[in-house]
C-alpha cells in the first residue's frame, strides 16, 4: 500500500508544479545565503589564521560554500523540471531522469543535514586549534625582528584589544613566556642578569603583561608590570583588588565568538534543510502524480501521488534486496575476471 497517497486532478497538478517552481527558486536564494555565510566565516577564520593551529577549522565554511553551490545547481534544475512538467512533450525528456534525480536530492539532503550538525558539534576541535595556535603565537610575540614573525606582536595586540581578552587562558599566561625581545633588554643591568640567571632556560620572565591587556574602563591607570608585587604600587593588593586588566583568556573569547557564528549558521542551515526536504517531497508527489495518469491523452483525468509506493518496512526490505543483488552481481563479475578467458578447444 502506498504511503501518504493523495489524489490529484489537473488543477492540483498545475498548482503543485507552480508552487514547486517558486519554492525551487527561493531555495536558489537560500543556497546563495549559505554560500555567503560560508564565505564570511572563512574570511573571519583567515583573519586570525596566525593564532590557529591548522586548517581543520575551515571544514565548516568549506562545507557551507559547497552545499550552497550545490543547492543553487540542483534547485535551478528542479525549477526547470517543474516548469516543463505541465507540457507533455517537454516532460517526456525529463521522465527517465526523475528517479535518479530524486535519489540525488535525498543524498544532498543528508549531506545538508550533516553540515548543519557540524556547525553545532565542531566546538571541541576549534577549541584545541585555538589553544595550540594562541600558545605558539604568544611565544613569537617578541620576535619583531624575525622575518615571518614580525607581524605577530601586532596580531596579538589587536586581538586582545578587539576581543577584550588577555593571554591564552588568562593574563598569567604572559608570566610563563619571555614576551620582551632581547633587543630591548639592558644586559648590563643587574636586575636583567638576575632574572635570566634565575631561569633554567635563560629566559627573561616578568610578572607583567603587554599594554593590550589593559582595560581602558578601569578608573586606575593601567598596572601592567610587577602585578604580583603589592609593595610596588600604592594601595594595591593583587589578590583582593580587581585588576585593571582583561581577565578573560583569548581562547574563551574567540571560541565564544566563532561558536555563536557557527550556531547561528547551523540554525539557518537546518531551516534550509527543512525547506529542501519539503521540495523533495513535493517533487516526489509531482513525479508519481504524472506517472499514474491513466489516460495521457486526457489531461483532465485524475491521478494519485505518493511518497513511497509501499510501506516503510517493505520499501526498506526491497532496498536491501536490491543492494544484495548488486553486491552479488559485482562478486560474479569479479570471479569471472579472475578465472580469465576460457581455453580454446584443441
Swiss-Prot record:
Region (Interaction with MREG) location: 341-346
Knocked-out gene: effects: Knockout mice fail to form retinal disk structures, resulting in an absence of the photoreceptor outer segment. At postnatal day 14 the photoreceptor inner segment is stunted and at postnatal day 21 shows disorganization and cell lysis in addition to outer nuclear layer degeneration resulting in a gradual decline in photoreceptors. At postnatal day 21 mice show progressive thinning of the outer plexiform layer and disorganization of the photoreceptor synaptic termini.
One GO molecular-function entry: protein homodimerization activity
Principal place of residence: membrane
Keywords recorded for this protein, A-Z: Cell adhesion, Cell projection, Disulfide bond, Glycoprotein, Membrane, Sensory transduction, Transmembrane, Transmembrane helix, Vision
GO BP annotations, alphabetical order: cell adhesion; detection of light stimulus involved in visual perception; photoreceptor cell outer segment organization; protein heterooligomerization; protein homooligomerization; response to low light intensity stimulus; retina development in camera-type eye
Impact noted for substituting residue 141 to C: Reduced cone and rod photoreceptor function as a result of outer segment malformation, including disorganization, short outer segments, and elongated disks which affect both rod and cone photoreceptors
Lumenal domain ranges by topology: 44-61, 124-264
Membrane topology: Multi-pass membrane protein
Transmembrane segments: 25-43, 62-80, 100-123, 265-290
Topological region Cytoplasmic: 1-24, 81-99, 291-346
Protein's cellular compartments: Membrane; Cell projection, Cilium, Photoreceptor outer segment; Photoreceptor inner segment
One cellular component (GO) term of this entry: membrane
Annotated Pfam families: Tetraspanin
Glycan-carrying positions: 53, 229
UniProt-listed InterPro entries: Peripherin/rom-1, Peripherin/rom-1_CS, Peripherin_LEL, Tetraspanin/Peripherin, Tetraspanin_EC2_sf
Disorder noted: Responsible for retinal degeneration slow (Rds).
Summary of the function given for this chain in its UniProt record: Essential for retina photoreceptor outer segment disk morphogenesis, may also play a role with ROM1 in the maintenance of outer segment disk structure. Required for the maintenance of retinal outer nuclear layer thickness. Required for the correct development and organization of the photoreceptor inner segment.
Oligomer status and interactors: Homodimer; disulfide-linked. Forms a homotetramer. Forms a heterotetramer with ROM1. Homotetramer and heterotetramer core complexes go on to form higher order complexes by formation of intermolecular disulfide bonds. Interacts with MREG. Interacts with STX3 isoform 3B. Interacts with SNAP25.
Protein name according to UniProt: Peripherin-2
Lineage, top ranks: Eukaryota, Metazoa, Chordata, Craniata, Vertebrata
Amino acid at each position: 500500500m502506498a504511503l501518504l497517497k493523495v489524489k490529484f486532478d489537473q488543477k492540483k497538478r498545475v498548482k503543485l508544479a507552480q508552487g514547486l517552481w517558486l519554492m525551487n527558486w527561493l531555495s536558489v536564494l537560500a543556497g546563495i545565503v549559505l554560500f555567503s555565510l560560508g564565505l564570511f566565516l572563512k574570511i573571519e577564520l583567515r583573519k586570525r589564521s596566525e593564532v590557529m593551529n591548522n586548517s581543520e577549522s575551515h571544514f565548516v565554511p568549506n562545507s557551507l560554500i559547497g552545499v550552497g553551490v550545490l543547492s543553487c545547481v540542483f534547485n535551478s534544475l528542479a525549477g526547470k523540471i517543474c516548469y516543463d512538467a505541465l507540457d507533455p512533450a517537454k516532460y517526456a525528456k525529463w521522465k527517465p531522469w526523475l528517479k535518479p534525480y530524486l535519489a540525488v536530492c535525498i543524498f544532498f539532503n543528508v549531506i545538508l543535514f550533516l553540515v548543519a550538525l557540524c556547525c553545532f558539534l565542531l566546538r571541541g576541535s576549534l577549541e584545541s586549534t585555538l589553544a595550540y595556535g594562541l600558545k605558539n603565537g604568544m611565544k613569537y610575540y617578541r620576535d619583531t625582528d624575525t622575518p615571518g614573525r614580525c607581524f605577530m606582536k601586532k596580531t596579538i595586540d589587536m586581538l586582545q584589544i578587539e576581543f577584550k581578552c588577555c593571554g591564552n587562558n588568562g593574563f598569567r599566561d604572559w608570566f610563563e613566556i619571555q614576551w620582551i625581545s632581547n633587543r630591548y633588554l639592558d644586559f648590563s643591568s643587574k636586575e636583567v642578569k638576575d632574572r635570566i640567571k634565575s631561569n633554567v632556560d635563560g629566559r627573561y620572565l616578568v610578572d607583567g603583561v603587554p599594554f593590550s591587556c589593559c582595560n581602558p574602563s578601569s578608573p586606575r591607570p593601567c598596572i601592567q608590570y610587577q602585578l604580583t608585587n603589592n609593595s610596588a604600587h600604592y594601595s594595591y593588593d593583587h589578590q583582593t583588588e580587581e585588576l585593571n586588566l582583561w581577565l578573560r583568556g583569548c581562547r574563551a573569547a574567540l571560541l565564544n565568538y566563532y561558536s555563536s557564528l557557527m550556531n547561528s549558521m547551523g540554525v539557518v542551515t537546518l531551516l534550509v534543510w527543512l525547506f529542501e526536504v519539503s521540495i523533495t517531497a513535493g517533487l516526489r508527489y509531482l513525479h508519481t502524480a504524472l506517472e499514474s495518469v491513466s489516460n495521457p491523452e486526457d489531461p483532465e483525468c485524475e491521478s494519485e501521488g505518493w511518497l513511497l509506493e509501499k510501506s516503510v518496512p517493505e520499501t526498506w526490505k526491497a532496498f536491501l534486496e536490491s543492494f544484495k543483488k548488486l553486491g552479488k552481481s559485482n562478486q560474479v563479475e569479479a570471479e569471472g575476471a579472475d578465472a580469465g578467458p576460457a581455453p580454446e578447444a584443441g
